[in-house]
């Protein structure tokens, strides 16, 4: 009986210690959105040279490196993601916010993630 109780206690402890990715209902992270080929799809145009798990990246957009140096003010980066046509009418980058391809919350998550690169 003690062995069974110890086994159950061990299983419960293991379940509680599982990382958030294994938990149902977990909200998407900025990286999830960036890597999502049907949502953000940032990988289609941008390279992510510091992320080994970023496979099959594009090269038509600037690489996502040194983002804090390039965008010291995160609001400028957010504005670019929301609608890059404001600063460059001929850009190929989709206006993710203007066209509601991403929600405000999703854009904030993407900005936080990309700014950390």
Regions picked out by a protein language model, each given a short descriptive name:
Residues 1-5:
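Positively charged n-region of N-terminal signal peptides that target proteins for export
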């Amino acid at each position: 009986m003690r062995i069974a109780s110890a086994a159950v206690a061990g299983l419960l402890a293991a379940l509680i210690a599982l990382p958030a990715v294994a938990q149902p209902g977990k909200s998407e992270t900025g990286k999830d959105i960036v890597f999502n080929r049907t949502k953000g799809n940032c990988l289609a145009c941008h390279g992510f040279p510091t992320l080994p798990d970023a496979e099959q990246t594009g090269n038509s957009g600037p690489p996502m490196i040194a983002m804090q140096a390039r965008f010291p003010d995160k609001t400028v980066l957010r504005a670019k993601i929301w609608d890059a046509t404001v600063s460059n009418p001929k850009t190929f980058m989709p206006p993710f916010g203007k066209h509601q391809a991403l929600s405000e919350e999703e854009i904030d998550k993407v900005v936080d993630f990309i700014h950390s690169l």
